[in-house]
Curated annotation (Swiss-Prot):
Pfam family, one: Nop
Lineage: Eukaryota, Fungi, Dikarya, Basidiomycota, Ustilaginomycotina
A Gene Ontology cellular-component term: nucleolus
MF GO annotations: snoRNA binding; snRNA binding
Protein name: Nucleolar protein 58
Signal peptide: none
Family that this chain belongs to: Belongs to the NOP5/NOP56 family.
Amino acid composition bias (Low complexity), ranges on this chain: 507-519
Known function: Required for pre-18S rRNA processing. May bind microtubules.
Bias (Basic and acidic residues) ranges: 485-496, 521-531, 538-549
Keywords: Nucleus, Ribonucleoprotein, Ribosome biogenesis, rRNA processing
Primary location class: nucleus
GO biological process: box C/D sno(s)RNA 3'-end processing; endonucleolytic cleavage in 5'-ETS of tricistronic rRNA transcript (SSU-rRNA, 5.8S rRNA, LSU-rRNA); endonucleolytic cleavage in ITS1 to separate SSU-rRNA from 5.8S rRNA and LSU-rRNA from tricistronic rRNA transcript (SSU-rRNA, 5.8S rRNA, LSU-rRNA); endonucleolytic cleavage to generate mature 5'-end of SSU-rRNA from (SSU-rRNA, 5.8S rRNA, LSU-rRNA); protein localization to nucleolus; snoRNA guided rRNA 2'-O-methylation
Residue intervals of the Nop domain: 293-417
Length: 582
């Protein structure tokens, strides 16, 4: 006997195949199951195991989809096949290969799986209502009830596959944080309007009361400022601020307003109070939602920052797909793309900057702290997004976030201590206190160094060398001056002429010094230097002697003429005589 196992929304069904020869002709099998009458002739309901509730149905159907045999299925097959009559002769057909191997292994019966028999299951599924309703006895079932149960089971099975939980709907968090930001803007606008409006009547009150809600409540309770002394503000303000407010109301410089103005101000104050109260309720709702959806992320960065991260990414699953580097700069996209465009430094943090761990860090450590918080936040987000809903509802669910926060706090204290020690060390270094640390070698200025300017000696250098005192002259012989590039290009005779001209200029520019001093200086000079000085003096004297001799001759001839009484010879006569002689 061949039997077919088929799972339905009602339960597990066993069908007897009346003609097993038709199963061998698989090509024509679909023709026998096209009509309800043909399906009823080929298959007969043998037994059915009804599900007691939806949870049992979801568990059993999920086990079959995974190729496993549930306890209820094992009991059903044991009662109907193993303990029944004709155990060795019966053959069971199933739709899953893994399920077939598990049943054959655990129950020891003959189980068949053939992919060519899929038309058989397709025909059973199409004519299931007819096959179940045609049965007699307790197994009869209304087709309408079957459709209802199939729909309910499909929804439950889909929810189980997706691990759906109403508390895990992050859309509520996205909408709540968006509404919270809008309410903050609206409260700020209305509160500023109230202060500007009522400030004409009581301008000093704006500096005394800074809280927007307390400001609106005081206006609602007091009305005109003249009623301040008779109004009790103990439920709204502290005692010190209340006394200051009453004292300022008596000497206020504000103008008077009418009853109509005050009524409109009161209505605006009512709006501020109601919106602020609703904002408080919404914040509590957001806290509860974040604790249910992302407990680890909330424990690490806080509910507001976590909700803004989820809202910016779109959903918790999308946020879990981001790496830690993206989580770190999430919310700073404009600054990031501007930095990439201008080739400047990229931002170090985005929305995560507003977390308490980054906020309490010093300015120098904010970037490093943001990177570490983003790393731990990425792990917490993935755990919150992919963990089961039952796991997160436990008391110890956010342990990963709490442990990560404790580690980051200890790490922050260690970094602050290191930065403090380095600051003290730099201060000691600036003050000159090096401690026991040995100083590194540094080249200090002030020692004797090589004078490159002494390599090329010009006219002024020679003159200064000649005028130097003997004690200031170097004890070592001077090196011969090197020729310049222009002198190298000249010929040997031209270079000699240039040297002579320079020496003559030096000798002409020398002041007359006493002979004793020059002789004493010459004694201290080296042999080569004395020769050079003598030669320069001779050249200078040789240039000046012809002119002096001519002047001396003219003076002597004039004196002789005066003594002898002969007339003075004209300058042109000598030239004429010379020309005649020539």
């Amino acid at each position: 006997m061949v039997k077919v196992l088929f799972e339905t929304a009602v339960g597990f069904c066993l069908f007897n195949v009346s003609d097993s020869s038709k199963l061998e002709a698989t090509k024509n099998l679909h023709e026998s199951l096209d009509s309800a009458e043909g399906a009823s002739n080929l298959l007969k309901l043998s037994a059915i195991h009804r599900f007691t509730n939806t949870a049992e149905a979801v568990e059993d159907i999920s086990a079959i989809n995974e190729g496993k045999m549930s306890k209820s299925l094992k009991k059903f097959l044991t009662d109907e096949i193993v303990e029944g009559k004709g155990k060795e002769k019966e053959n069971l057909i199933v739709a899953e290969s893994k399920l077939a191997s598990n049943i054959a292994k655990k129950l020891g019966i003959q189980v068949t799986y053939d992919s060519e028999l899929l038309d058989l299951y397709r025909g059973i599924r199409e004519n299931l209502a007819t096959l179940l309703s045609s049965s007699s006895g307790d197994e009869s079932l209304d087709p309408r009830d079957l459709n209802t149960m199939s729909l309910g089971l499909s929804h439950s099975l889909s929810r189980y596959k997706l691990k759906f939980s109403p508390d895990k709907v992050d859309t509520m968090v996205v909408q709540a944080i968006g509404l919270l930001d809008d309410l903050d803007k609206e409260i700020n606008i209305y509160a500023m309007r109230v202060k500007e409006w009522y400030g004409w009547h009581f301008p000093e009150m704006g500096k005394i009361i800074t809280d927007n809600l307390a400001y609106a409540k005081v206006i609602r309770a007091m009305g005109f400022r003249t009623n301040a002394s008779a109004t009790d503000f103990s439920e709204i303000l502290p005692e010190e601020i209340e006394e200051t407010l009453k004292a300022a109301a008596e000497i206020s410089m504000g103008t008077e307003i009418s009853e109509t103005d005050l009524e409109h101000i009161w209505s605006l104050c009512d709006q501020v109070i109601s919106i602020t109260q609703y904002r408080t309720q919404l914040y509590q709702y957001l806290q509860n939602r974040m604790a249910a959806i992302a407990p680890n992320l909330t424990a690490l960065v806080g509910d507001l920052v976590g909700a803004r991260l989820i809202s910016h990414a779109g959903s918790l699953m999308n946020l879990a797909k981001h790496p830690a580097s993206t989580v770190q700069i999430l919310g700073a996209e404009k600054a990031l793309f501007r930095a990439l465009k201008t080739k400047h430094d990229t931002p170090k943090y985005g929305l995560i900057y507003h977390s308490s761990l980054v906020g309490q860090a010093p300015q120098k450590l904010k970037g490093k702290m943001a990177r570490m918080v983003a790393t731990k936040a990425a792990l917490s987000i993935r755990l919150d997004a992919l963990a089961d809903a039952d796991t997160k509802s436990d008391e110890g669910a956010p342990t990963v976030g709490i442990e990560a926060r404790a580690k980051l706090e200890s790490r922050l204290r260690a970094l602050e201590m290191q930065s403090g020690l380095s600051g003290m060390r730099s201060a000691r270094n600036a003050a000159g206190d090096q401690g026991h640390k040995q100083k590194g070698f540094q080249m200090e200025a002030g020692g004797r160094s090589y004078n490159a300017a002494a390599d090329a000696a010009g006219p002024s250098d020679m003159a200064s060398a000649a005028n130097m005192a003997p004690s200031m002259l170097p004890s070592t012989p001077a090196k011969p001056s090197t020729t310049t590039d222009e002198e190298k290009k000249l010929s040997k005779e031209e270079r000699k002429a240039l040297k002579k001209a320079r020496k003559s200029e030096i000798a002409a520019s020398e002041p007359a010094t006493p002979a004793a001093a020059s002789e004493a200086g010459d004694d201290k000079l080296s042999k080569e230097e004395r020769k050079a000085l003598k030669k320069a003096k001779k050249d200078a004297n040789g240039v000046e002697t012809p002119k002096k001799e001519k002047k001396d001759k003219k003076k002597r001839s004039a004196d002789e003429a005066d003594v002898n009484g002969t007339p003075k010879s004209e300058p042109g006569s000598s030239k004429k005589k010379k020309s005649k002689k020539d």
